[in-house]
Regions:
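Short alpha-helical scaffolding segments that buttress acidic/His motifs in well-ordered protein cores
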Residues: 8, 67, 167-168
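Conserved AAA+ ATPase core "coupling" helix
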Residues: 2-13
């Protein structure tokens, strides 16, 4: 709900972008959305996108739908679990990595795939939602550079395979 996103904004961020910042992000996403609509990848409208970003900012609006799918999971404590998971994601995004990069500085919106499953605390939280996926995470998504997605991404120099794999994972929780 919108109340949950207000709680997250208040508890997780000292400050969030201005209304002008949000409108600028919406404009950038509109172009990508229009291109996706032309290719018939989505039927999402510009109005739906605008409202979704305004309500969920600084999170991508799709995170609401994806996380809502697993809030009924017995291993997930609904609001408390949602706050814990997003807190860990945000903490990780704002922590400098081994290369001195703060990932949050490169993001316009926080997506469901913005979780480092090589981060022990974050991985433990995700595995706690559905423990049966532990082997799949290690084999397919994140195993300190040894998973299938990490190997493919190393070859391409991008994180696309891990991002897609994490979206599928979150959808299955």
């Amino acid at each position: 709900t919108d109340d949950l996103y207000n709680i997250l904004r208040t508890r997780l961020f000292e400050e969030v972008g201005s209304e002008e910042d949000v409108l600028e992000i919406i404009e950038g996403y509109k172009d990508a959305l229009n291109e996706a609509r032309q290719m018939q990848y989505t039927n999402y409208t510009v109005d739906e996108l605008s409202l979704g970003i305004k309500n969920a900012y600084p999170f991508h609006p799709s995170i609401r739908d994806l996380f809502a799918r697993f809030k009924e999971n017995p291993g997930f404590q609904q609001t408390r679990g949602y706050i814990r998971l997003t807190r860990l994601m945000v903490k990780d995004l704002y922590t400098e990595d081994e290369n001195g990069i703060i990932k949050a500085k490169e993001k316009y919106l926080i997506n469901a795939y913005d979780m480092d499953l090589n981060n022990g605390e974050l991985a433990t939280t995700v595995r706690g939602i559905k423990s049966s996926i532990s082997n799949a995470i290690a084999h397919d998504i994140a195993d300190n550079g040894s998973s299938i997605a990490e190997i493919i991404d190393k070859d391409t120099g991008k994180t696309d395979m891990q991002d897609i794999s994490k979206l599928i994972l979150v959808s299955s929780l």
